[in-house]
Amino acid sequence: MSWFKQLWQNSREKGQYYELQAQKYLVSQGLTAIERNYYCPFGELDVIMKDGNTLVFVEVKFRKNHARGGANYALSIQKQARLKRSIYHYLAAKNLTNQPLRIDYVAITGEPSMHINWLKNVF
């Protein structure tokens, strides 16, 4: 086992690490961090950012290599549906109406060196 794999006790820690890397990247691109790991009955919202007045919900996926398309192709139809329901829950819980929003996807591939692919307004 490599030293890199020993950094995490479980997959949740690994996911949180890559969500933080995605958040840092998006901040470097001019977005403002709002919240991470918002949990609700429908699932989790990985990263919530603001781009100007637009609320940006960011789904983060990591894959260590490009097998089966890598992280770029890891967002399933089922995950998209859960993500939408979670966003509706967040908006209702925070009493946000008439809020411009978009859904972005950050695909991170590679371990230990990372390649970040940021896709805006994915669905």
From Swiss-Prot:
SUPFAM superfamilies: Restriction endonuclease-like. It comes from the Bacteria. One of its GO terms (molecular function) is nucleic acid binding. Gene3D superfamilies: 3.40.1350.10. Belongs to the UPF0102 family. NCBIfam families: PRK12497.1-3 (NF009150), YraN family protein (TIGR00252). This is UPF0102 protein PSHAa2523.
